[in-house]
């Protein structure tokens, strides 16, 4: 079974909690705080596995969670870091954020890796909050939660040459003749419903990978049929072999077919349309008027395509010439990397010290709403029921300039300050 898309949930490990502990040992008066820090949560990383060819593994398992950091303990014992999680994917996998549909990573090379979720930071133990004026802190920092998100995996085949054309023109037959691939071959449309790969290894030429993509129909660039799925698989190919049925047995016009397929390519991607093409007039063994091929060749030449060959995949006539020309052209064509437009790239949220303050009116009261990633992280580290922890919270707000900014905005005695679900009254 060929699976080329998957949707999975990934989550890095939560950080371990810091410990609240005091040294209690005989003959050691005033031992002081000795709570250790929690361990960091495990990361989630995608790595390329050259041995994988589909995303079938993700059909049965869709939830991936890294290990949690161990909590800190007394005697300044630090918690162990959570176990990292490695997810193997085939070469050519694109990772998209489901929420934004933006591309997070393109894993198209053998050694590519991408860390998608960083583990949560371990919380500090109470010994880290000891100061000359706070000699016995009764609070510690909880571990930060790990990152989590749904991602879509999309496999774009890595092949040197892509076979292009309408259904039932002989692409699968050509692939079976020049490689050891065994695609399904029959005399009806859409015999091929999934891409097939094969290695062309002919004496005297450099081996290359050929992909037989299911037949493209008119409107494929707009998603008609499975058009977008099929077109996606030829985006990475360096060279296209455009196969047409020159025999006219099915009543098709080879020139019109050629124009329509190229129009679909252009509508889907101009860069794909500009890719070098070898034009192959297949089923020439069923052609009884040589002038039909010559007229076809002349029309294709007018469109700017000069590599036109006559071939019969069924009898192997002309196949060797096509393969040798493809091998020769590949020597001069660089490897194609998928270019991702700027507006489709995923930009991670800035996790540095950021916040906003917005004044609002509620029931006649002035409320200053403080929001941002800094606020979320700070509140996780505060125990509002512990006086020492609240004093630490007040000190952080003061040191970060939030109280100063509130005064600049005109806050008055008795106004409310809201940080997420936590509110307090401002007193001058």
UniProtKB/Swiss-Prot annotation:
Q: Where does GTP bind?
A: 165-172, 190-194, 212-215, 282-285, 312-314
Instruction: Give a GO cellular-component term.
Output: cytoplasm
Keyword set includes Metal-binding: yes
Q: Per the UniProt record, which EC number(s) apply here?
A: 3.6.5.-
Which cysteines share a disulfide bond? Answer: none
OCT domain span: 345-428
Provide the function of this protein.
An essential GTPase which binds GTP, GDP and possibly (p)ppGpp with moderate affinity, with high nucleotide exchange rates and a fairly low GTP hydrolysis rate. Plays a role in control of the cell cycle, stress response, ribosome biogenesis and in those bacteria that undergo differentiation, in morphogenesis control.
What family does the entry list? Answer: Belongs to the TRAFAC class OBG-HflX-like GTPase superfamily. OBG GTPase family.
The molecule here is called: GTPase Obg
**Organism expressing this protein natively:** Clostridium perfringens (strain 13 / Type A)
């Amino acid at each position: 079974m060929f699976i080329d898309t998957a949707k999975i949930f990934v989550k890095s490990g939560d950080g371990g909690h810091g410990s609240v502990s005091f040294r209690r040992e005989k003959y050691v008066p005033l031992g002081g705080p000795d709570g250790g820090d929690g361990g960091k949560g495990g990361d989630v990383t995608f790595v390329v596995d050259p041995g994988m060819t589909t995303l079938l593994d993700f059909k049965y398992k869709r939830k991936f969670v890294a290990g949690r950091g161990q909590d800190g303990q007394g005697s300044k014992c630090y918690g162990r870091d959570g176990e990292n999680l490695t997810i193997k994917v085939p070469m050519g996998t694109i990772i998209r954020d489901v929420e934004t549909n933006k591309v997070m990573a393109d894993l198209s090379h053998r050694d590519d890796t991408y860390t998608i979720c960083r583990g949560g930071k371990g919380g500090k133990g109470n010994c880290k909050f000891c100061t000359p004026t706070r000699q016995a802190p009764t609070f510690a920092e909880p571990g930060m939660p790990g990152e989590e998100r749904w991602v879509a995996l999309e496999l774009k085949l890595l092949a040197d040459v892509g076979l292009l054309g309408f259904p039932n023109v002989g692409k699968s037959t050509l692939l079976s003749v020049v490689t050891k691939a065994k695609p399904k071959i029959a005399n009806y449309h859409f015999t091929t419903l999934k891409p097939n790969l094969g290695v062309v290894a002919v004496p005297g030429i450099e081996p290359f990978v050929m992909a037989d993509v299911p037949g493209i129909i008119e409107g494929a660039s707009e998603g008609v049929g499975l058009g977008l799925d099929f077109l996606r698989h030829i985006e990475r190919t360096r060279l296209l072999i455009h196969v047409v049925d020159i025999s006219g047995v099915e009543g098709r016009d080879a020139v019109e077919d050629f124009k329509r397929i190229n129009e679909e390519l252009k509508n889907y991607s101009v860069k794909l349309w500009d890719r070098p093409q070898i034009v192959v007039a297949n089923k020439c063994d069923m052609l009884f008027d040589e002038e039909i091929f010559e007229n076809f060749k002349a029309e294709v030449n007018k469109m700017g395509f000069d590599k036109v060959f006559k071939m019969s995949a069924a009898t192997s006539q002309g196949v060797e010439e096509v393969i040798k020309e493809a091998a020769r052209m590949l020597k001069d064509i660089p490897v194609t990397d998928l270019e991702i437009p700027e507006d489709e790239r995923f930009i991670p949220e800035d996790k540095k010290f950021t916040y906003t303050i917005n004044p609002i009116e509620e029931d006649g009261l002035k409320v200053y709403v403080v929001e941002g990633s800094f606020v979320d992280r700070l509140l996780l580290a505060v125990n509002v029921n512990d006086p020492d922890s609240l004093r630490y919270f007040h000190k952080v707000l003061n040191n970060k300039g939030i109280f100063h900014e509130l005064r600049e905005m005109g806050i008055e005695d008795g106004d409310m300050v809201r940080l997420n679900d936590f509110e307090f009254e401002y007193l001058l």
